[in-house]
């Protein structure tokens, strides 16, 4: 129990209800049947449970520990970079060591070859513990999935290992300043150079985690229009634009022409900074075309279903966590504890004993 601004807050150590998770995975979805498939033949239910338990420990120790602090001390721009509270970097390192970013990928790719449903369940714990901090690895996984699905073999070789091991992080830049809804209105331009690379110029806004010091490099997936491309959605292409360029030998080169123009204020998820980025103030930011020209929206749409599921699961995780907080509060708190006139709050009945409170808790749980 803590007291803030004169109000009693009752905390809970539970992130999610483990019994509910077991019911969903093994009784409702019959996840164990996946073990009959050749791809998961080397796994077991014990491994699934151990994965979830390890994730729960990381969520409790490295994510939940700074949820309140990260809301009170959101990222700040120091004139060069966006700085976070120390716990954010510790959480990133912990989740990288856990292997969540690449857990679904095959052993050949360096992953854990876990079923998608187990990975999703693990992410529920992380989202419930601190959904803002969890956005860093979720966007990195989305970036890796785009490159894995549509990038060239050379692009996969250069970027995927570092994205999977947490050396690089990733973002997806879609919206532009003054363009909030229609991707077909994208004005960012891309010019082809003699060496086969592109130079892009323009602005992107609402880029979540567009700048930070958690990783050595940030890989931006950016939608732009190649010069001479058709108007509308059919003329948009997808590009890889790294914050730091990569030399042929794999070492870091010079900084790309990407400038942080603004760090936007947020109502929620404050530990994930929403940024405005400027690409190519001079010659243009160096970019690498993903897949075929003019297929950018098609490629991005392929990961949207997965993104929608992840966002929805995050909402479900927060709702479940909110219910646990409400339940714990009702069990420990009595109406007299909120009243300054009470001399002996410990002997009063708890809120959970109220029929109306039970009704509200049941309604909250059902949703």
Segments predicted by a language model, with ranges:
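Short, glycine/acidic-rich hinge or "gate" loops at secondary-structure transitions
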Residues: 66-78, 135-139, 331-345
């Amino acid at each position: 129990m803590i007291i803030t601004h004169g109000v009693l807050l009752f905390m809970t150590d539970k992130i999610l209800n483990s019994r509910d998770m077991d019911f969903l995975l093994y009784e409702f979805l019959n996840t164990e049947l996946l073990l009959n498939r050749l791809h998961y033949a080397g796994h077991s239910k014990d491994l699934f449970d151990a994965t979830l338990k390890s994730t729960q420990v990381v969520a409790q120790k490295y994510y939940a520990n700074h949820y309140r602090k990260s809301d009170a001390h959101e990222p700040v721009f120091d004139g060069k970079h966006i700085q976070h509270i120390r716990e954010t970097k510790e959480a990133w390192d912990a989740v990288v060591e856990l292997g969540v970013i690449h857990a679904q990928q095959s052993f050949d790719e360096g992953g854990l070859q876990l079923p998608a449903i187990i990975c999703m369940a693990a992410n529920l714990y992380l989202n419930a513990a601190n959904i803002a901090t969890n956005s860093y690895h979720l966007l990195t996984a989305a970036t890796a999935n785009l490159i894995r699905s549509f990038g060239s073999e050379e692009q996969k070789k250069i970027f995927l290992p570092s994205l999977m091991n947490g050396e690089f992080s990733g973002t997806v830049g879609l919206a532009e300043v003054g363009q909030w809804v229609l991707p077909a209105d994208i004005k960012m331009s891309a010019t082809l150079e003699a060496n086969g690379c592109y130079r892009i110029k323009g602005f992107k806004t609402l880029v979540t985690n567009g700048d930070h010091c958690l990783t050595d490099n940030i890989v931006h997936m950016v939608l732009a229009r190649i010069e001479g491309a058709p108007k509308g959605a059919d003329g948009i292409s997808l590009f890889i634009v790294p914050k730091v360029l990569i030399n042929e030998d794999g070492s870091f080169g010079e900084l790309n022409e990407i400038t942080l123009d603004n760090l936007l204020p947020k109502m929620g998820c404050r530990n994930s900074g929403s940024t405005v980025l400027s690409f190519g103030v001079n010659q243009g930011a160096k970019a690498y075309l993903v897949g075929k020209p003019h297929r950018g929206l098609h490629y991005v749409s392929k990961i949207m279903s997965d993104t929608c599921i992840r966002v929805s699961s995050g909402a479900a995780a927060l709702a479940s966590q909110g219910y646990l907080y409400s339940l714990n509060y009702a069990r420990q708190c009595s109406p007299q504890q909120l009243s300054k006139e009470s001399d002996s709050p410990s002997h009063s009945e708890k809120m959970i004993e109220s029929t109306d409170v039970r009704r509200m808790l049941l309604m909250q749980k059902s949703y």
